[in-house]
Design a protein with these regions (language model features):
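Intrinsic disorder
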Residues: 1-105
Length: 105
């Protein structure tokens, strides 16, 4: 923070945000409402924190910010497999599902 930033009301940006407990609750609810769910952990990038993508049997998916440890714990709690997307990639059914979605202009 610069010397005058505090006087101007500027705040530092960046830093690690803590995962939202509501996100974990949402992921549990989402997974329990679908079958054949698998978790794919996406690594931290310069733009985003670590995230997990849950993919159902039909390719429907959802993504939320969560720690890798949290994602593994979620998988254990739900009894679903957890994969590292950097090693295994995304499942084809996820790409097929996304391709069928209506295009937004």
């Amino acid at each position: 923070m610069g010397m005058f930033d505090a006087l101007r009301g500027r705040r530092r940006s960046g830093g690690v945000r803590k995962p939202d407990p509501a996100s974990s609750a949402y992921l549990v609810s989402w997974a329990q409402a679908r079958r054949g769910v698998e978790a794919y952990v996406e690594p931290k990038t310069t733009v985003t924190e670590t995230t997990v993508v849950l993919v159902a049997h039909d390719g429907e998916w959802t993504r939320r910010r969560i720690t890798e440890h949290g994602a593994r714990g979620l998988g254990k709690k739900l009894g679903i497999p957890v994969y590292d997307v950097g090693k295994v990639g995304y499942p084809q059914r996820m790409r097929d599902y996304t391709a069928k979605l209506p295009k937004v202009d």
